[in-house]
Amino acid sequence: VGLHYQIHRGIGVHHAEALKRGQSLPVNIFVGGPPAFTVAAVMPLPEGLSELRFAGLLGGCRAAVHYSRRLPLPVLAEADFCISGHILPHLKPEGPFGDHVGYYSLKHDFPVLQVEAVHHRTGAIWPYTAVGRPPQEDTVFGDFIHELTGALVPQVFQGVREVHAVDAAGVHPLLLALGSERYTPYEAQRRPRELLTAALHMLGTTQTALAKYVLVAAHEDAPGLRARDVVAFFRHLLERTDFERDLHFITRSTTDTLDYTGFALNEGSKLIWASAGEKRRELALEVHDLPSLPEGFGDARCAGPGILVLRGPRHELGRNETDPRMEELAACLAHWPQRDAFPLVVVADDAAFCAADFDNFLWVAFSRSDPAADVYGTGAVVRARHWSCEGPLLLDARIKPFHAPALEEDPVVQRRVDALAAPGGPLHGLIE
């Protein structure tokens, strides 16, 4: 069977060691069992902390294991199924399949597991979860992880008070964080200094290292602000951003395996957007006096305070190609009287859908763009390797030819599930 394992999940470390020794890596895949097993499997644990130990800690007792002379690894006694085998030295194409970001992952070569045994309990149940654009069933895991790890955040990331990997954006594409800005308390104007150190720390360890857009605000500027209040967070950030100072790109970096917006598989860019200080601008909720836009752009809509969404022409360029039409749009907006009131402009294929609600905006804007390739700006320049602009900031969130296709629900299956949840159905009251 194909062994699709994503980067920064830990198994690659063990696989690399086995290859170094010239050995095939033994693998046990456990399915089902107590809920603590499932939570431990998706928990972003530090390297060296066993999922078995964490499952025991979470479940309140040691996880029972069974040792067999026929298997090199122990078997979880309470698991419903155990698939045992070794990783073969060659690769095979795997995919496509639906993912939790809301797309069909494309076909790629991955390691192959030679299955040698399958064990199961009496009356075993094979659990599964439906995937697709969030929120889905696995959203509750993300909420639970935030609840479990919230108190640990300041200990793991010095100077960080709160983080929120935004589920509506697909989790890894967007990370919001509140931090402290204490490096130079004697300065008259607060500016992001400690926040940048904290952002780089978050991109250097744990699962936050896979974040694509890292938006960081200073707790001192708004003590009541919370990272989980996404609309308020964006408003706070857009009111304070200095576009000549606050955007920091990391190019050709490591990205999540499921993100197809970047340079290649597992490779793309990141953007640290860190703002601190006093409010700079008033944001608008209504669009006025928009200049005549370049051909193909239109249907202006407001997605939130200071966020303008435009329909754009179909994207037909290749990876990492600068779109002259986006640069033309940026130049056009330089003459817009409301340019400061709408500091963020998102270009999408369907402006009405993107602006219909804030979750739509988050999903489209951050799951369909790569910072280095898709961020433009009015008056953009590069000085001393630092990209800046006068504003507004433009984000090209159109679907590109090399993107994974969006996951679409099968209406026949959807009706069957709805029937199960209807009054009198076996799942009535359990699902909505």
Report residues per predicted region.
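Internal mixed beta-strand/loop scaffold within catalytic domains of large alpha/beta enzymes
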Residues: 1-32
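Charged, compositionally biased interaction regions
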Residues: 33-432
